[in-house]
Design a protein with these regions (language model features):
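Enzymes that bind and transform nitrogen-containing heteroaromatic metabolites
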Residues: 3-8, 13-17, 22-24, 80, ...
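A short, flexible N-terminal coil/short beta segment enriched in small residues
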Residues: 10-14, 29, 34-41, 130-143, ...
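Charged/polar positions on well-ordered alpha helices
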Residues: 12, 16, 43, 53-57, ...
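Proteins enriched for Cys/Gly/acidic motifs involved in redox and nucleic-acid/cofactor modification
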Residues: 19-21, 112, 126-154
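Short, conserved alpha-helical segments within structured domains
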Residues: 25-27, 127-130, 298
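Short beta-strand scaffold segments in enzyme catalytic cores
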Residues: 26-35, 153-154, 361
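Zn2+-dependent cytidine deaminase-like catalytic core
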Residues: 31-130, 215, 246-251, 307
Length: 378
């Protein structure tokens, strides 16, 4: 096997931790000696052993003189687990091949430096682009302390997310809907608007046994959420946050908040100067709550607000081979729109694939001020 194949194996191992490691990154490690893999591992869950230590624990023979391929710079600080640099040094590994650089200020090059000072050969930025793709959420959250927001919607070939009556079940087929369940498991939070709650009464949970459900966030400026909605009734089972604007703190609003709290719902007031929810303030609050990523499953109004607020980093669009037609049928992004094509929000397509009979397109959002590639481009 080649160096590239060993690192590719480490990348595949890292992906096994998807949905479980947050807010930690996904990391894989492979230990090679005399052209043979003698140990491998990945970070399975936040709070548990890191990839390097799991790889060492799986060793079939001494790692003295071996090379370890790791997708992210080894940590060098004490947290919930001891430093991985210590374990690598103790095993007398002679070479460390690193993919991504760790943006965590507690590491940020210090891990590689400690290894070099111990006489270990360190190769950095090996297959960095491929390794960076594992952890856009981690890189964003560790540097901004705000969630990485992914906007997801399903639409027909003529760009409709619902019929003129508001009906939307189901636009895509079962394979695409199963992928959405996987996405809900992958991200720490899921966010929808009050319009979606009133129209569909969704649970916004994961319906696959053994997968974790995200924290549910509802944007509801005027606190219209029904106390008998599925989301409120299940709030003691799944953490639920309702964000409101607090335009008028009257007795009725106060009573509604108290009743929501009694049912297990958390509330947060994030008003802007227009009496709507300030999504940037909400992201700061959610980041402080330890929520590193959000799957935005909003309607056209919330999607428009999120894009205008600049909080969306990725767009995942599922397109079904159907036509709804109708000027009153709902679209993924509402609002007043733009006047000229040159004013469009620029996206960079990173993946297109077929899922059953449907097509999924993934794009990164480019910064408006930027010329050339997206800031998030890996």
């Amino acid at each position: 096997m080649t160096d590239q194949e060993y690192m590719f194996r480490a990348i595949q191992l890292a992906k096994k931790g998807e949905g479980w490691t947050n807010p930690n990154p996904m990391v894989g490690a492979v230990i090679v000696k005399d052209g043979r893999i003698i140990g491998e591992g990945y970070h399975k869950k936040c709070g548990e052993l890191h990839a390097e230590r799991n790889a060492i624990a799986s060793l079939t023979e001494s790692a003295e003189g071996a090379t370890i391929y790791v997708t992210l710079e080894p940590c060098c600080h004490y947290g919930k687990t001891p430093p991985c640099t210590e374990a690598i040094i103790e095993q007398k590994i002679k070479k460390v091949v690193i993919g991504s650089r760790d943006s965590n200020p507690k590491v940020a090059g210090k891990g590689a430096q400690i290894l070099r000072e111990s006489g270990i050969t360190v190769v950095q930025d090996f297959m960095r682009e491929e390794c960076d793709r594992l952890n856009p959420v981690f890189f964003h959250y560790i540097t901004t302390k705000t969630p990485y927001v992914v906007m997801k919607y399903a639409m027909t070939l003529d760009g409709k997310i619902a019929t003129k009556t508001g009906a939307s079940k189901w636009i895509t087929g079962e394979p695409a809907r199963q992928e959405v369940q996987h996405m809900r498991h992958r991200y720490m939070g899921i966010m929808a608007g009050i319009g979606t709650v009133l129209a569909d009464d969704p649970m916004l949970n994961v319906r696959v046994e053994g997968w974790k459900s995200p924290v549910r966030i509802v944007c509801d400026s005027s606190l219209r959420i029904p106390l008998d909605s599925q989301i409120v009734r299940s709030a003691k089972e799944y953490r639920t946050i309702v964000a409101y604007a607090g335009r008028e703190e009257n007795e009725e609003i106060t009573e509604k908040i108290e009743r929501l709290h009694a049912k297990g719902v958390d509330t947060v007031c994030c008003p802007d100067e227009k009496g709507q929810i300030d999504l940037k303030k909400l992201m700061t609050y959610l980041g402080n709550e330890g929520i590193d990523s959000i799957l935005l499953e909003g309607g056209g109004t919330l999607n428009d607000s999120a894009l205008r607020a600049g909080i969306v980093k990725e767009v995942h669009c599922f397109i079904a081979p159907k036509l709804f037609g109708g000027k009153n049928s709902k679209t993924p992004v509402q609002g007043i729109g733009i006047g000229l094509p040159s004013e469009a929000l620029k996206l960079k397509c990173t993946d297109i694939c077929r899922i059953g009979e449907d097509i999924r397109i993934i794009c990164q959002v480019c910064e408006k001020e930027q010329e050339g590639p997206c800031l998030q481009e890996s």
